[in-house]
Amino acid sequence: MASLLQLRDAIALNGSAEASQLSRQLAIPLPLVNAMLEKLTAMGKIERIELDHSGCLTGSCKSCPEGHQHCNTVIYQLKEPHAHQ
């Protein structure tokens, strides 16, 4: 089974990643990946980013061939350390 460190490393290697991508890449069930991502987020190691698809070409997710779920993309990336000044 993959560890939190392996999940964090996979995000680092990809730059950013969706939960489903990490699930496939690491062969971990999606519910477990989601729980691990929540834990890493709570620990301050990664950040959750909801992508804004308001610039969709069709202007309406209802008629989008990708479906409504495609419009609600959430990615994870490493949290940038605060620079000391």
From Swiss-Prot:
Keyword Repressor in record: yes
Signal sequence annotation: none
Database matches in SUPFAM superfamilies: Winged helix' DNA-binding domain
Xref: InterPro entries: FeoC, Tscrpt_reg_HTH_FeoC, WH-like_DNA-bd_sf, WH_DNA-bd_sf
Keywords: DNA-binding, Iron, Iron-sulfur, Metal-binding, Repressor, Transcription, Transcription regulation
Positions bound to iron-sulfur cluster: C56, C61, C64, C71
MF (Gene Ontology): DNA binding; iron ion binding; iron-sulfur cluster binding
Name by which UniProt lists this protein: Probable [Fe-S]-dependent transcriptional repressor
Originating species: Yersinia pestis
